[in-house]
Amino acid sequence: MNKIKQIIIVEGKTDTDKLKSIYGNDLKTIQTKGLSLNKKTLEMIEEFNNKMGVIIFTDPDGAGKKIRQTIIDYLDNKVLNAFIKKDDINKTSKKIGIAEASDDAIKKALDNLIIYDKNNVSLSWTDYINNDFYLKSNRIVICKYFNFDNNISSKTLFKWLNWMNVSIDDIKKIIGE
């Protein structure tokens, strides 16, 4: 099994426990303690990102999206992201989180990291609208391709596509044009 060199940012202890059950006790995580993410934790994440890199791996719910966005907005440079879909969560669980996902879904997410760079601008809003990428049917296809949650807003998808440096031609290939 591949050893993960970066620090993984998760929401809580159960997420850390789940990841360590898969990757071993040498795996390093930082827990945001849910939405109580504070400046000190953000500074620590920034320091680790500059030294060894971090992977943001938050739950596929509203709080997880907000935590991910807060961290990305705080960091100045590239950051790795892992995504898990709600469909990958144990159906009998009342919670929607990393701790409730299957081992295979977690491995797949961490094997398919996506790099975000806030400084990328590969797509204009006009191009995004004129090519109908904002339409729900196209957003679903794009989100599925990148393993994003299907319920992200059009503006968030636009921003994330730019941060990943995805071109118009790339998106057209994804949606089958």
Swiss-Prot record:
Q: What GO annotations for molecular function exist for this entry?
A: metal ion binding; ribonuclease M5 activity; rRNA binding
Catalytic activity, reaction form: Endonucleolytic cleavage of RNA, removing 21 and 42 nucleotides, respectively, from the 5'- and 3'-termini of a 5S-rRNA precursor
- Cite the binding residues for Mg(2+) 1: E11, D59
Which GO cellular component term is one of those annotated? cytoplasm
Q: Which residues form the Toprim domain?
A: 5-99
Cofactor names: Mg(2+)
* Residue positions binding Mg(2+) 2: D59, D61
Q: Does the keyword Hydrolase apply?
A: yes
Cofactor binding note: Binds two Mg(2+) per subunit.
SUPFAM superfamilies, per database record: Toprim domain
EC number(s) recorded for this UniProt protein: 3.1.26.8
> Which GO BP terms sit in this record?
rRNA processing
Q: Give the matching Gene3D superfamilies.
A: 3.40.1360.10
Record's superkingdom?
Answer: Bacteria
Its subcellular locations are:
Cytoplasm
* Keyword vocabulary terms for this entry: Cytoplasm, Endonuclease, Hydrolase, Magnesium, Metal-binding, Nuclease, Ribosome biogenesis, RNA-binding, rRNA processing, rRNA-binding
Family that this chain belongs to: Belongs to the ribonuclease M5 family.
Record function comment: Required for correct processing of both the 5' and 3' ends of 5S rRNA precursor. Cleaves both sides of a double-stranded region yielding mature 5S rRNA in one step.
The record's section on PANTHER family has: RIBONUCLEASE M5
Q: What is this protein called?
A: Ribonuclease M5
